[in-house]
Each structure stands twice: as structure tokens, then as C-alpha cells.
Amino acid sequence: PVPPEPTLEEIRNCPVRSRIDDICVRAGLNPPPIDGRDMILHISDTPSTMFPYLRRAIRRLRPAWIVHTGDLVDDVKLECRPGLLDLYRKKLRILLNLLSDETCGAILITGNHDHLPTLLKMTENSTVQVWSRPGRFYIGSFRFRAGHTYEDVMNDAGEYNLFGHNMEHPTAIDAYGRFFL
């Protein structure tokens, strides 16, 4: 049988692990362990080389939800090279396995380098939600809008607006107190 994941308290109290962990956090290899039960982890434009770090981050942060705002396998540019669909599938499977191994909810929004038919087929028996266009969701009383680009969320903004794609529009709070992240 597979041993259970250590609790946050066990991670913090193990002296050897704590010392190694501290070194890894300082080196930027791991995020600090926190209790993220009420947290959303927003990611976007993830190259497959980032998947191992993403797995560690998810396990250590333990978010309630993961929202990916597109370009799931950003190192495979299907928009430019559609012949790489098999490679995209292979790398996408790694990401989907990573997400399905976790206990948090996940929303994936397609980006310009994603292939919706492949994504839908690969998630048909999964709890992962796939959105082909911008949308809204609520967590408690907090209203979120999520899309692949800033333009996807700016006109019909929620309290918290999640987007990726490029860095032309940095994180900001507008005059109405709405967050753009």
C-alpha cells in the first residue's frame, strides 16, 4: 500500500526534512508549505518542463482549486505546428494525470495553443472542468471571471479576474476595486 501524504504539521516538525526543505525553498525549488484549503492556484501558459515543479507546488500548497487560463502545454505550439498533436497529447496526459492525482477542483480554459477536441476527449471521465471560452465561477461569496486573455475578462469583469497569455496587462486593481490577476 502507498503510505499517506504527510500532514503539514509532520512536514514542519521533521528536523531532517525541515533542513532539506528550507534549502529547497531558499533555492526556489519548492514553495513553502502552507495550508491552502481556501486558496485558488492560478496558472497559465505552462511549458511541460514546469510540470514537476507544479506537482510539488500543488502538493505543498494544497489549494482548494486550480484554475489554468490556457496554453496547457505551452512548449508545443499547435497553432503554429499542428503536426505536433501527438506530442501535445503525450505531454497533456502528464498534466492531466498530475491534476487528477490531487484532491482539489480544477478548471482548464483553452488557449490559442490548445486543441479543444483532444482536451475534451482526454478529460471525458474526469472531474476536471474544461472551458472553451471565458466564464464565471463562485467560491463562497467571491465572484471570479476567468479567460485566456485580458480582453476575455475586461468587459464583463468579476471581483477577481484571472487571465494569462501575455504580460502586457500586469496584475492590477481597477477604479472599481476589481482585481485583474
Locate each region found by the language model:
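N-terminal active-site segment of His-dependent metallophosphoesterases
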Residues: 1-88
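Short, flexible, glycine/charge-rich loop motifs used to bind or transfer phosphoryl groups or to couple energy/partner
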Residues: 29-31, 56-57, 97, 134-135, ...
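Flexible, charged surface loops at secondary-structure boundaries
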Residues: 33-36, 59-61, 100-101, 138-140, ...
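A structural micro-motif
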Residues: 38, 64, 104, 128, ...
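Short beta-strand micro-motifs in enzyme catalytic cores
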Residues: 39, 115, 143-145
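Active-site neighborhood of phospho(di)ester-bond hydrolases with catalytic His/Asp-centered motifs
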Residues: 42-45, 66-71, 106-112, 146-148, ...
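Core catalytic region of metal-dependent phosphoesterases/phosphodiesterases
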Residues: 48-134
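Conserved beta-sheet core of the metallophosphoesterase superfamily
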Residues: 134, 138, 145-181
